[in-house]
A protein has these predicted regions:
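Extracellular/periplasmic, surface-exposed regions of secreted and cell-surface proteins
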Residues: 1-218, 223
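Disulfide-bonded cysteine-rich modules in secreted/extracellular proteins
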Residues: 223-230
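Calcium-binding motifs, dominated by EF-hand helix-loop-helix domains
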Residues: 240-244
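Acidic carboxylate motifs that coordinate Ca2+ or other divalent cations, activating on Asp/Glu
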Residues: 247
């Protein structure tokens, strides 16, 4: 019976959303599995422990979810009625980022698959880490360096880690009827580790919606709100907020 399994792939993907110098990305992956329950020394436990497998995985994926033609200079007709010249609509230059390239996520995972009583009870536990670099991000462009003040660029890093577990059981199994129950649980922690090309402790992050920001050291889309002040009975005091840096301003 199979005891050792190895799978490896190598992808080379191209996207017309990047220039010729950065168009192609190389994305490897590999998976290794050891079916421990098929080892001769596990023979004595096969009536109870019907499956036990250790899995290891590694892979790199690429993301290119941005608009088209952002790496080249282009012009478009202005739709602003104030940007006309003698009744003629003007052409305006659009912002561009010639050095755009693939955003890459490297994933590592280790997992255990198990089964008891001829797999009537089975499940798995998996731990993973994901490291993303060259985040495709919207950042401010310095005055005079581009045609617009916000451009798309590869800036930033992010880390994810988590645990996923599931267990399934065949409660009833007959010729005409099978009842299977299952339970799963997931824990994930995401943290942005970099958002600028150089370290800048004063950088305030990127707006991600109403009262939300992408900020280094926090989860993506973290809500930034005023800290409420409560009275001695635990009830919120209207329009009273904590002055966190004691500068006399909220």
């Amino acid at each position: 019976m199979d005891r050792y399994l190895l799978t490896a792939t190598l992808r080379r993907d191209g996207s017309s959303r990047f220039s010729e110098n950065n168009r192609w990305g190389l994305f490897p992956s590999a998976a290794l599995a050891w079916t421990i329950s098929n080892e001769p020394f596990m023979k004595a436990t096969e009536n109870v422990l019907s499956k036990l497998k250790l899995r290891l995985g590694y892979g790199v994926t690429g993301q290119q979810e941005i608009g088209d033609y952002q790496y080249i200079t282009s012009y478009s007709f202005s739709t602003n009625p104030n940007t006309t010249y003698l009744g003629t609509t003007l052409l305006k230059p659009n912002g561009y980022s010639p050095d755009l390239k693939w955003e890459q996520t490297t994933t590592y995972n280790v997992a255990i698959d198990f089964g008891f009583l001829n797999n009537r009870i089975n499940g798995s536990i998996e731990y993973y880490q994901k490291h993303t670099k060259d985040l495709l991000n919207t950042i401010s462009a310095a005055a005079g360096t581009n045609f617009i003040n916000l451009i798309t660029a590869n800036v930033g890093k992010m880390k994810n880690k988590g645990v996923e577990a599931n267990v399934n059981a065949i409660a009833i199994q007959s010729k005409d009827f099978t009842w299977e129950v299952g339970y799963n649980i997931t824990w994930n922690d995401s943290k942005i580790t970099k958002l600028t090309t150089t370290f800048n402790p004063d950088y305030q992050g990127i707006d991600a919606g109403t009262n939300q920001k992408h900020q280094v050291g926090e989860m993506p889309g973290t809500f930034y709100l005023y800290q409420q002040v409560y009275d001695e009975n635990g009830k919120p005091i209207q329009n009273a907020f904590v002055d966190r840096n004691n500068d006399g301003q909220i």
